Structures are given as C-alpha cells and as structure tokens.
Amino acid sequence: MKKLEDSASDLEISLYVVGGGLRNHWLDKPCTDLDFTCRGVTQLARRFAERIRRPCITLDDTPGRETLRVVVHKDSNFDFTELQGKTIEEDLAQRDFTINAMAQPLSGFLAGRTEYHDPHGGRRDLEKRLIRANPGPVLRADPLRLLRAFRFAATLGFEIEADTLAQITRFKEGINRVAVERILHELIL
C-alpha cells in the first residue's frame, strides 16, 4: 500500500478508497479487493503496477469512465475507476447504496485516521445494518442494483430499508433490460 501511496504522491493525485473494500474494512470483515477513485486513474494504475511488477488490466476504456485492475496477488485485486463528477461528493452521489457511497483519502486509510466523506449517511446505515438506496435515480439508472440490494442484505445480514424496497418494487420491470451476463455475474459473487 505504501507503493500505491507513493505512486499517487509522485503524480500529485488525490486518491480515495471507496466502495465495498472500505465498507468491509469498517465492518471488520476480511477484504481481499479494494476499490479506488481519482482523476488520472489510468496513469496511476499503470505506475503502481509497474512499481510492484504486477499486471494491470483495462476493464473499461470509455473516456471519463476508465476502470483498471491491478492484480496485486493471485487472490487480491485493486480496482481503479476515474472519478465521476467534479468532486468526490459528486462521485459518491452516483453510487448505488449509502453503504457503498463513502470515501476515505488513502493517506487517512493507511494511517488509521477517522476523516472520511459520507454525504448520504452510509456509516450510520452500517451501524443500523440497513441497505438504503442513495438519493436520486440510482436504482432506475441501473436496474442490476435491484438484485444487488438483495445480495448485500443476504451476505451482510442487513435489512433493506422500506423506501428502498418500495423503489425496487416500482422499478422491478427494469431488470428485463439488464444483460444476462451481468445478472449471472451478480448472482455468483
């Protein structure tokens, strides 16, 4: 992780730990994969991969949505996604559930500091063991998230918040627009 921090520092990049890895860290659950977001993600992921002499795989090369994976060990990956929006708060607003819409600067994560970005109350929902959709059209925007709510509830032992459950019911027909491969991938995670 120090080599990742050094790579970000060399490139003057503000790097954030986000998503399920951060969530699981705060739940004291084992975590072999970590997700990161920043501006300049392609350059950073490649620099880090070179520094640790591990493969770097491009998962999505769509401009502005680039996602790369560095295979850190045989059973551990670091995924890097281009920051969505102008700020970390704008990025977090586009994520599926409040428990996945939190971010911590890598330096703070490594130092065990407590500062973090949580604009939608994800930490509170972790404590309450709730799956709550982020505000806005996040479930309608990607209907696969309807299934993800149930997967998270089952794997984390959480309850789905009532309004989120109502949204799932309201948007359930949208699942028919999701590619079968994406659904299968979600079901086998």
Question: Where are the predicted features?
Answer:
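Catalytic cores of the polymerase beta-like nucleotidyltransferase superfamily
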Residues: M1-L189
